[in-house]
């Protein structure tokens, strides 16, 4: 019997320097939700009214669904199209961190919320038409056999679809509410920014190997898919934020991030500046030093608690 050869990954022979660069960024950014003191937000949570609490739980449940998709379907689908073993390794890291993100929302729920309210939100997520629709749209492309279209769908999920949900904790944070929860969300946003950038980079590398007509076809596909997702996301936003008066602000944030998603793919912005004008308070809440709780690049800060090792001495054991 003839055995096929199996090659071990060799990080000392890199075919694409971007793989090592992004691997190092992702591993240096590694974090876990257990290190964020979410319990410090209990007093602020209790001051939210019932409608605000329900909205927050629903927002985070919707985000959990997207992270679940990216963990179990999105990143694994991209791994099958990897051009290098190092790209495959980076995508496996991305897949794992999406699981961490999904776990993080459960940490928020178990710390701040009543189980019955969380259970109700999960039921809501399975019955909400726009939420289920965007999941189905993305999953359909992940199941296809067209690698570059998979990457387009993945970039739109990473760099656009999350942001109708990310808006809310940034809004609360800008008003001094749920600041530790916002720190955790910033950790997630930092990861998603790297994910969207990297997958977009791999998409642009893939374009180098196809014809001009195929490139044009993919560009049209990308813009058409974005508009399909945007129309659905606008409906989702209108339903989710219906009673708040914040719908227009969230839609502006969507347009802003849709343009960023297109830029990750190497394309020009679609939405004009007047449609993508985000409230400065939200942009300030997104900034690396918002609330001075969080170091955006190192993952450390007063809200991310890391233990310090101290050498013991003989006297320490004299009880």
Model-derived regions, located:
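Non-heme di-metal
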Residues: 1-319
């Amino acid at each position: 019997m003839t055995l096929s050869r199996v090659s071990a990954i060799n990080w000392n022979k890199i075919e694409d320097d971007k793989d090592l660069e992004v691997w190092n960024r992702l591993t240096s950014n590694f974090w876990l939700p257990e290190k964020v003191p979410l319990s410090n937000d209990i007093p602020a949570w209790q001051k939210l009214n019932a409608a605000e609490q329900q909205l927050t739980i629903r927002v985070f449940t919707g985000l959990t669904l997207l992270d679940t998709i990216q963990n179990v379907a999105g990143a694994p689908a991209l791994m099958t199209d990897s051009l290098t073993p190092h790209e495959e390794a980076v995508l496996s890291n991305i897949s794992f961190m999406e699981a961490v993100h999904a776990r993080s929302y459960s940490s928020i729920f178990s710390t701040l919320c009543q189980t019955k309210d969380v259970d109700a939100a999960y039921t809501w997520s399975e019955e909400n038409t726009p939420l289920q629709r965007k999941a189905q749209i993305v999953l359909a492309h992940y199941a296809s056999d067209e690698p570059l279209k998979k990457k387009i769908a993945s970039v739109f999920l990473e760099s656009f679809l999350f942001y109708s949900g990310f808006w809310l904790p940034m809004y609360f944070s800008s008003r001094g509410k749920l600041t530790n929860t916002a720190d955790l969300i910033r950790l997630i946003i930092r990861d998603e920014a790297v994910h969207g950038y990297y997958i977009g980079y791999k998409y642009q590398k893939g374009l180098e190997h196809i014809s001009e007509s195929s490139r044009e076809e993919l560009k049209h596909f990308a813009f058409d898919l974005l508009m399909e997702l945007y129309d659905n996301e606008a409906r989702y936003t209108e339903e989710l934020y219906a009673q708040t008066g914040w719908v227009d602000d969230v839609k502006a944030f969507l347009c802003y991030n849709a343009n960023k998603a297109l830029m990750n793919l190497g394309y020009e912005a679609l939405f004009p500046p007047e449609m993508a004008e985000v409230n400065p308070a939200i942009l300030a809440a997104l900034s690396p030093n918002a609330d001075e709780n969080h170091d955006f690049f190192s993952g450390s800060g007063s809200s991310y608690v890391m233990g310090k090792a101290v050498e013991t001495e003989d006297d320490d054991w004299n009880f």
